[in-house]
């Protein structure tokens, strides 16, 4: 019942065979392959001779474990006042060996993204960098990709709201020679990013601070 052979003899190694080739078939899915490992021979020392033994071989299981892969959401940007659709291809893949290449030609094509506090669609979100705003919640792949074969880790990304370009143009104003004037602080036009005069979110520029460059107003 013990593991000690007589006369100090030792079985040092055994010849093993993966019955269905799971050991070298890199596309074998994650799971336990029962009785996959078969012993086909042995080598010993200290006087061991196989002919002196009635050797019985019992099979063993081969387990394929998940492969660790990290998906990192890339930083995305939008303009203040505009909603956006998050780009589901804006992510990076880091495989177990440190590169971006998955085994067997498998590919992760897109990821499901979520803006944690809704900055992607809340047009009143102020300009700035919203750290860790973009979260990955899932993925879709091709070329045989199956999420069950991977231990997937998700890393969040930032969402940046950039300033909105708006042009304020001072209108022509007039005065009579000999009279000073007060410049009309409502005499201007607004040109928004999209070409009209309407700012987002119902915002309004009511007045502007005006200056007569050479003092002609006075």
Give the predicted meaning of each segment:
Residues 1-218:
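Solvent-exposed beta-strand/loop surfaces, strongest in extracytoplasmic domains of secreted
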